[in-house]
């Protein structure tokens, strides 16, 4: 990573031994190794995030291009993801399909949008209530 050879490491070790002494040198080496490990992990994390963002950006651009060109000649990976989304949407709507079909058929039979029970309630509400005497 830093392109440091064997003799450079020996020189750094000797200088560290002279400056820090034999008691504090192992602790200093552990601290430096911990910092280096943390820096490597952070760099790998940033690298994976950038890779994911670039892939998302590429997919987004492909989707925009596909919507402009139509869905005829898509990238196979993009076509696969679109098919998966359609299948998921279909699976989510399956439990409600029977209810939707029932509602459509009832609306086709009764275009006003009210059921027979609602019609009977509406008809009964149209009758005038019995007249009450003022003396009571």
Swiss-Prot record:
<comment type="function">
    <text>Part of the twin-arginine translocation (Tat) system that transports large folded proteins containing a characteristic twin-arginine motif in their signal peptide across membranes. Together with TatC, TatB is part of a receptor directly interacting with Tat signal peptides. TatB may form an oligomeric binding site that transiently accommodates folded Tat precursor proteins before their translocation.</text>
</comment>
<comment type="subunit">
    <text>The Tat system comprises two distinct complexes: a TatABC complex, containing multiple copies of TatA, TatB and TatC subunits, and a separate TatA complex, containing only TatA subunits. Substrates initially bind to the TatABC complex, which probably triggers association of the separate TatA complex to form the active translocon.</text>
</comment>
<keyword id="KW-0653">Protein transport</keyword>
<dbReference type="Pfam" id="PF02416">
    <property type="entry name" value="TatA_B_E"/>
</dbReference>
<dbReference type="GO" id="GO:0008320">
    <property type="term" value="F:protein transmembrane transporter activity"/>
</dbReference>
<keyword id="KW-0813">Transport</keyword>
<dbReference type="InterPro" id="IPR003369">
    <property type="entry name" value="TatA/B/E"/>
</dbReference>
<dbReference type="GO" id="GO:0043953">
    <property type="term" value="P:protein transport by the Tat complex"/>
</dbReference>
<keyword id="KW-1133">Transmembrane helix</keyword>
<feature type="transmembrane region" description="Helical">
    <location>
        <begin position="1"/>
        <end position="21"/>
    </location>
</feature>
<keyword id="KW-0811">Translocation</keyword>
<dbReference type="InterPro" id="IPR018448">
    <property type="entry name" value="TatB"/>
</dbReference>
<keyword id="KW-1003">Cell membrane</keyword>
<keyword id="KW-0472">Membrane</keyword>
<feature type="compositionally biased region" description="Basic and acidic residues">
    <location>
        <begin position="96"/>
        <end position="107"/>
    </location>
</feature>
<feature type="compositionally biased region" description="Polar residues">
    <location>
        <begin position="108"/>
        <end position="130"/>
    </location>
</feature>
<feature type="region of interest" description="Disordered">
    <location>
        <begin position="66"/>
        <end position="136"/>
    </location>
</feature>
<protein>
    <recommendedName>
        <fullName>Sec-independent protein translocase protein TatB</fullName>
    </recommendedName>
</protein>
<dbReference type="GO" id="GO:0033281">
    <property type="term" value="C:TAT protein transport complex"/>
</dbReference>
<keyword id="KW-0997">Cell inner membrane</keyword>
<comment type="similarity">
    <text>Belongs to the TatB family.</text>
</comment>
<feature type="compositionally biased region" description="Basic and acidic residues">
    <location>
        <begin position="77"/>
        <end position="89"/>
    </location>
</feature>
<keyword id="KW-0812">Transmembrane</keyword>
């Amino acid at each position: 990573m830093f392109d440091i050879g064997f003799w450079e490491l020996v020189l750094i070790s000797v200088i560290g031994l002279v400056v820090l002494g034999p008691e504090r040198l192992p602790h200093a080496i552990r601290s430096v190794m911990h910092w280096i490990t943390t820096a490597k992990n952070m760099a790998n994390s940033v690298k994976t995030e950038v890779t994911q963002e670039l892939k998302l950006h590429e997919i987004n651009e492909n989707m925009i291009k596909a919507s402009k060109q139509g869905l005829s000649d898509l990238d196979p990976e993009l076509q696969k993801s679109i098919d998966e989304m359609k299948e998921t949407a279909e699976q989510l709507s399956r439990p409600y399909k029977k209810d939707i079909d029932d509602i459509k058929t009832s609306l086709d039979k009764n275009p006003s949008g009210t059921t027979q029970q609602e019609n009977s309630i509406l008809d009964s509400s149209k009758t005038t209530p019995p007249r009450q005497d003022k003396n009571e």
